[in-house]
Amino acid sequence: MNPIVINRLQRKLGYTFQQQELLLQALTHRSASSKHNERLEFLGDSILSFVIANALFQRFPRVDEGDMSRMRATLVRGNTLAEMGREFDLGECLRLGPGELKSGGFRRESILADTVEALIGGVFLDSDIQTVERLILDWYRSRLDEISPGDKQKDPKTRLQEFLQGRHLPLPSYLVVQVRGEAHDQEFTIHCQVSGLSEPVVGTGSSRRKAEQAAAEQALIKLELE
């Protein structure tokens, strides 16, 4: 991989890997090599959840568990991580197989989100928990400053359902219209039909649940709740 691209990424991350092979593994999708990033992603997911949970616990001493769980879910959900991946310009650094390259995997939200988690796992193995915690908090500084407890942190499907129920409208219906990819790396496309919207709203995700949440979020935007 181009060293200029790698160095630019490390500057954006705010961290330089001592073991460059960990960085390369974190950037490697399973379509490109047998030494891919899924184990690092597993590790990074757990570390991220802990660091964000601890940060919320310290910041909001009077907030109950339900609100903290919803805030954490907002901060660690796939589209937040994918947004962060785009801020790092991860797409230009990913190591993808020919099929994923052809299908635009370098901009797929699920791949960007998974890679951010893999980078967190890689940083932990390259350093220690204190270093990776400081790095995560640096990445999340503005998002942590902006977040607050309340109904806004409920997941999109719940918010959409409550909105419709409050207006005595039928509940939304979700229909799987397409499933792409292999069993280990699928992308679901969902159509969500909502009273008050003339056309179905489309959502995609790496699981049916994530695709439904994405569709519900788009429906909320169209209903001008966001």
Swiss-Prot record:
One of its GO terms (molecular function) is double-stranded RNA binding. Its cofactor is Mg(2+). InterPro entries: dsRBD_dom, RNase_III, RNase_III_dom, RNase_III_sf. The active site is at D45, E117. Keywords: Cytoplasm, Endonuclease, Hydrolase, Magnesium, Metal-binding, mRNA processing, Nuclease, RNA-binding, rRNA processing, rRNA-binding, tRNA processing. It comes from the Bacteria. PANTHER family: RIBONUCLEASE 3, RIBONUCLEASE III. This is Ribonuclease 3.
